[in-house]
């Protein structure tokens, strides 16, 4: 997994360094809301942190294992949060656009509508459509 220096900009796009943005969540702190969790999960994809991605995935939909781009061919280019919606006291949805490139290919834009649930005080990724 790539490492981030404490003063490196956070991959999630917020104007903070990694150590004060997504770093604490990757180290085990609970995200305060669904958007923050989604941003931390994006940063985990950038860092190829499968352990965090699995830990932040709700047990009811979590896969047994997760295969990321181990060859390092995917370059994540940026994240834009388009909409965050609290759908209930313990549920939320986040729509975002992620940009990436595989190898020397053209940049790709991916839009995802993710659902999140709060369980025992922690937010988890549930699924996407």
Swiss-Prot record:
Gene3D superfamilies, A to Z: 3.10.450.50
Transmembrane segments: none
InterPro entries per UniProt: NTF2-like_dom_sf, SEC_C_motif, UPF0225, YchJ-like_M
Family according to the record: Belongs to the UPF0225 family.
Protein name: UPF0225 protein XOO0286
Organism this protein belongs to: Xanthomonas oryzae pv. oryzae (strain KACC10331 / KXO85)
